[in-house]
Amino acid sequence: MNSATKFFKITNKKQKHYGHKYKKGINILPDKFNLTGSCVKGGFYFTNARNIFNYLEYNGYVGYYVREVYLPISDPEFIMVKDPDNDKSFMIMMNDPPGDKWRANKIILGSKLELSKLDTIKYLIQEGADPIIRNNLLIRWAVKNGYLEIIEYLLDIGANIRDYHNDAFKSTIKSGNNDMLKYLIIKGIDIHFDDNYAIKRAAYYGHYDVVKLLLEKGANIHTNYEEPIRLAAENGHYDVVVLLLNYGCDISAYHNYAIKTAARNGYYNVVLLVAKKLNEQGIRFDDALISACNTGSLSIIKLLIENGADYSYNDYEVFKLACKYGHINIVRYMFILGTDITIKNNYGLRWAARNGHLLVVEYLIEHGANIHAKNNYAIKWAFENDHYDVYTFLKEIQSINEIFEYIKYDRILMNIFYKIVNLTTCIINFDNL
């Protein structure tokens, strides 16, 4: 005989959990039943009507259906335990335990109902489900998923759409659901909540229509040092940046945050737009070069310089960082522009060697860098940091230099050396005939 008590279980759309595919009727655990732990494999989970809305979304498990659950209590092999959500030491076996969540080795599944349907929500509430459990989780879940019928019904029976720090409003902004935002505004939601959280987050996520609606409703674009436009630029949302500029945002706010972060993240079109706006205002943005160099974006470096940034900014900081981080293309570009590669006592070579950037080391030496600078710093630190390819290369160059230094002061050896060079050149030329 089965229990007359009705329990409930929420399943995902595939009705699978821990590898088990749920079906109508009896479901039997194929593996060993787990007597201990919480939210672990080794059992079928279910709850009573009152607590069912606790599990709409649980531990990353997104609910789609709710199933009626009955228990085969007359089966001698049936096992049921209370799952100890908070008290990990409490675990007892029983036939009809108190509590809000249980685990069994066998369950019988009845009707399957879609959670997105208003009739399903009404049915569960009639069965005893608490519609405001967990800080009005049900209405927050309905807002997040755009279930307007369910929202209206819940508001009619007293649910609080602003509960849990306006979570419903926040999730709407995050998802970019413009229709839901319009609905919430009609219902009296405060768009200025939490220092204009809404427009800042909408700009961050690039939700153009949401930002536009909030602007039309009077959101403060200047909040927290022009944070909306700074976040839009930082995340590459070109259209949102243009929109906010049209509403009067200060694009240079917070020490040129917008162009520096857009440059760092490689958003070419945003950088170009902001650079032009800053030029119109006579505002320099040389420091954006540093941001671009940190991530090695040559295209952004070129764009900034072509639009007025000074590549010699802060004692050629871009060149020094490019050497330090191994950005060979930027190093070459800086040299073409006229950078003295020996600046600051051959800083570029010293740090390229220290960090193991062989291509940069080779390029710098080819163009006149001094491997002996600062008491053979490059050689010492290449060895110290186990960059043996760089160390070997530098030692070979050092040996060649020592040979040249030696023969330079010996006339006989110098003459012999030049004869060897001339003879080698003749042989090569003869072979090429």
From Swiss-Prot:
The keyword Lyase does not apply. The keyword Repeat applies. ANK repeats lie at residues 104-133, 134-163, 165-193, 194-223, 224-253, 254-283, 284-313, 315-343, 344-373. Keywords: ANK repeat, Repeat. This is Putative ankyrin repeat protein R267. SUPFAM superfamilies: Ankyrin repeat. Signal peptide: none annotated.
